């Protein structure tokens, strides 16, 4: 994926990513000076950096939608496994739960 090509100098923390996502929700494509506003909201990135981050995100999404990204191979897990912290009582409770 494209995001793996990013250098460490342009790495993003989870907090920066969350601020980026929130800013994208506020400043849509029709907002004047969108990337400057998003950069201000993130706080520690330039307009060029947030635009590049957005372009990488769009490319990643397109690759996922086109099935170019393989699904992860998950291990099967025994739900009743004591090592997972679930005992028989918990299993009976979950079995009888009704979500409303």
Curated annotation (Swiss-Prot):
Transmembrane segments: none annotated. It comes from the Eukaryota. The keyword rRNA-binding does not apply. Coiled coil: none annotated. Keywords: Nucleus, Transcription, Transcription regulation. It is found in: Nucleus. CDD domains: SANT. GO terms for cellular component: nucleus. One of its GO terms (molecular function) is DNA-binding transcription factor activity. Residues 7-59 form the SANT domain. SMART domains: SANT. Probable transcription factor. Assigned as a member of the MYB-related gene family, I-box-binding-like subfamily. This is Protein RADIALIS-like 5. It comes from Arabidopsis thaliana. The gene is RL5.
């Amino acid at each position: 994926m494209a995001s793996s090509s990013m250098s460490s100098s342009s790495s993003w923390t989870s907090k920066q990513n969350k601020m980026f996502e929130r800013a994208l929700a506020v400043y849509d494509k029709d907002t004047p000076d969108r990337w400057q506003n998003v950069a201000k909201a993130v706080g520690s990135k330039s307009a060029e950096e947030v635009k590049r981050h957005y372009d990488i995100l769009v490319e990643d999404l397109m690759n996922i939608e086109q099935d170019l990204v393989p699904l992860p191979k998950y291990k099967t897990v025994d739900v009743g496994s004591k090592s997972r912290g679930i005992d028989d009582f918990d299993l009976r409770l979950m079995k009888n739960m009704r979500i409303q």
